[in-house]
């Protein structure tokens, strides 16, 4: 039973649950909850791709995880690298086959864009200053566009996708700040490993301010109403301001670790802002 749990842990079950719920919320925003088949297929595709990417990333991150995440299943030896690689391939295949049940545009986004981008990122772009962070953010943003394509409403998901991109980019950057020691030892050329914590904190502050201002733009231009603003301020704007003031005071690795988790929460709440606005109106 323990062995089974370690293999499940490899896939990051909490992340998978979050991605499944995100697809449900996306469907709700597009008034598509009654389209059960499309909803279930989009959930399974996103979960399969997410799980596969998590397993494959752990394979590629083995050396850095020895320092940064010593309790991960591959590092502890509870899951073999060959097995993790096989699981990743299997899940990528299952997700791709399931995508064939959806529209041509959804198939292209999943198989033609998301899948190769995830593999190229893990093999070649991880640790590349800023580009690696941007690619991860693009992959997450594509999940929202994929959902929109599946339901025939890509336009509806463009703004949520942009917000998800911004928050994910910042989270990945802050996570690199938290992992600066392990990344430096492994020779990864991340932005924080290259320029240090102080300069990285300044970049994070500027990014947080830009993302915070950008998130207000849809409300100020009348795309969304007061419900969107209220949820956005509570779950996104306030956490971003916390990052700004904390990093202005004294940037530390422990702070970065904490804020990377806060930003994961903010990404979910940001999506809920669109859901609440749609539901209340």
Question: Which ranges hold each PLM region?
Answer:
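Extended hydrophobic alpha-helices typical of membrane-associated regions
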Residues: 2, 218-281
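Structural signal for membrane-spanning alpha-helices in multi-pass inner-membrane proteins
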Residues: 23-30, 95-103, 118-122, 143-151, ...
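Small-residue-rich segments of transmembrane alpha-helices in multi-pass membrane proteins
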Residues: 17-26, 75, 134-151, 192-197, ...
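Intramembrane alpha-helical segments
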Residues: 2-9, 74-155, 159
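C-terminal ends of transmembrane helices
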Residues: 63, 116-129, 176, 243-252
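Functional transmembrane core segments of multi-pass inner-membrane proteins
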Residues: 29-41, 110, 134-184, 197-210
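Membrane-embedded alpha-helical segments that form the functional core of polytopic membrane enzymes
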Residues: 20-60, 92-96, 105-121, 154-174
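Multi-pass membrane catalytic core of lipid/isoprenoid biosynthesis enzymes
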Residues: 44-45, 62-111, 188-224, 265
């Amino acid at each position: 039973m323990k062995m089974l749990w370690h293999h499940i842990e490899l896939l990051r079950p909490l992340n998978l649950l979050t991605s499944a719920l995100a697809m449900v919320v996306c469907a709700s925003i597009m008034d598509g909850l009654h389209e059960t088949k499309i909803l279930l297929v989009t959930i399974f595709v996103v979960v399969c791709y997410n799980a596969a990417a998590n397993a494959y990333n752990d394979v590629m991150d083995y050396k850095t995880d020895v320092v940064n995440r010593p309790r991960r299943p591959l590092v502890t030896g509870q899951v073999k690298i060959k097995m993790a690689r096989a699981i990743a391939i299997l899940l990528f295949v299952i997700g791709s086959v399931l995508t064939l049940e959806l529209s041509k545009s959804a198939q292209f986004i999943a198989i033609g864009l998301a899948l190769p981008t995830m593999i190229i990122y893990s093999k070649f772009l991880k640790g590349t200053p800023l580009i690696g962070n941007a690619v991860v953010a693009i992959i997450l943003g594509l999940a929202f566009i994929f959902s929109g394509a599946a339901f025939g409403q890509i336009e509806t998901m463009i703004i949520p996708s942009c917000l998800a991109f911004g928050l994910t980019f910042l989270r990945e950057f802050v996570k690199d700040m938290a992992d600066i020691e392990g990344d430096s030892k492994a020779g990864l050329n991340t932005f924080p490993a290259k320029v240090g914590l102080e300069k990285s904190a300044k970049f994070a502050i500027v990014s947080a301010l830009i993302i915070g201002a950008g998130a207000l733009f849809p409300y100020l231009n009348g795309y969304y109403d007061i419900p969107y603003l209220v949820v956005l301020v509570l779950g996104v704007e306030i956490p971003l301001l916390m990052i700004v003031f904390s990093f202005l005071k004294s940037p530390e690795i422990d702070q970065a670790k904490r804020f990377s988790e806060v930003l994961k929460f903010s990404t979910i709440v940001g999506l809920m802002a669109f859901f609440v606005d749609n539901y209340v109106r």
